[in-house]
């Protein structure tokens, strides 16, 4: 993870999920100004994008300092990603493991595309620091979440844009329990409660069932990881 600078602006990949909300808090605690970018790529759980507004309202309520730092929130439509992908995140099919050992929720190239588009927007807006919630500690095995992938992409983007671009991944070596703890450390119980209530993780887009860790089907891999992390975090917090 590249060191952050307190006098710079950062662009955070902000989907409306637990990880991106935690990364937003991390960026707000380290940068002078923070902008956000989300992607509409035809995902089944597009409800996550709708969660961003309430999350941002919550961030403003938690801290006047955070409120003053929050900048523009951008949304980019990438329908082509859904058109070329045949996955459980972009099709109404059952979630299962593929023959290659990866779950069929893996959207090939998704994070590579997200970060490249984010870097293009950041270039136009004079931003050199980009923050993403990629993690290879407690994850589904996606190869584009690995640290070596992110470091290689950082080098490629910096070379291709002739500018020193920094990709920050504050969750890379944290499991989900540690991610919950980081939210607690950054924003106290108010931030944890905000993430529980208004962030979205469930791959199926389920918002009807409320659990102690938030909303979701409770069965998909994303819900399972979030629930497991919550149980471990809660046990340590007692």
Swiss-Prot record:
Pfam families according to UniProt: QueC (PF06508)
Entry EC number(s): 6.3.4.20
Superkingdom to which the source organism belongs: Bacteria
Reactions listed under catalytic activity: 7-carboxy-7-deazaguanine + NH4(+) + ATP = 7-cyano-7-deazaguanine + ADP + phosphate + H2O + H(+)
Cofactor binding comment, as recorded: Binds 1 zinc ion per subunit.
Residues that coordinate or bind ATP: 14-24
Annotated SUPFAM superfamilies: Adenine nucleotide alpha hydrolases-like
Listed GO MF terms: ATP binding; ligase activity, forming carbon-nitrogen bonds; zinc ion binding
Gene Ontology BP annotations: queuosine biosynthetic process
The entry's keywords: ATP-binding, Ligase, Metal-binding, Nucleotide-binding, Queuosine biosynthesis, Zinc
EC class: ligase
Pathway linked to the protein: Purine metabolism; 7-cyano-7-deazaguanine biosynthesis
InterPro entries: QueC (IPR018317), Rossmann-like_a/b/a_fold (IPR014729)
NCBIfam families for the chain: 7-cyano-7-deazaguanine synthase QueC
Function: Catalyzes the ATP-dependent conversion of 7-carboxy-7-deazaguanine (CDG) to 7-cyano-7-deazaguanine (preQ(0)).
Family: Belongs to the QueC family.
Name of the protein described by the UniProt record: 7-cyano-7-deazaguanine synthase
């Amino acid at each position: 993870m590249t060191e952050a600078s307190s006098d710079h602006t950062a662009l955070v990949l902000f989907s409306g999920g637990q990880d991106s909300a935690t990364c937003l808090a991390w960026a707000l605690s380290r940068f002078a100004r923070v902008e956000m970018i989300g992607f509409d790529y035809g995902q089944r759980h597009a409800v996550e994008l709708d969660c961003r507004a309430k999350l941002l309202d919550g961030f403003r309520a938690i801290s006047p300092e955070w409120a003053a730092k929050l900048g523009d929130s951008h949304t980019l439509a990438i329908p082509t990603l859904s058109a070329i992908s045949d996955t459980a995140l972009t099709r109404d099919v059952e979630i299962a493991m593929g023959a290659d050992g990866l779950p069929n929720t893996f959207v090939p190239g998704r994070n590579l595309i997200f970060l490249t588009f984010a870097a293009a927007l950041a270039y136009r807006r004079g931003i050199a620091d980009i923050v993403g919630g990629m993690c290879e500690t407690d994850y589904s095995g996606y190869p584009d979440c690995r640290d070596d992938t992110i470091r290689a992409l950082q080098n490629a983007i910096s070379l291709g844009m002739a500018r020193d671009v920094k990709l920050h991944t504050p969750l890379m070596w944290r499991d989900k329990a540690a991610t919950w703890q980081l939210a607690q450390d950054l924003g106290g119980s108010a931030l944890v409660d905000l993430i529980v209530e208004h962030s979205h993780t469930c791959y199926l887009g389920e918002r009807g069932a409320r659990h102690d860790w938030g909303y979701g089907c409770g069965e998909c891999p994303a819900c399972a990881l979030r629930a497991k992390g919550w149980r471990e975090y809660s046990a340590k917090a007692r």
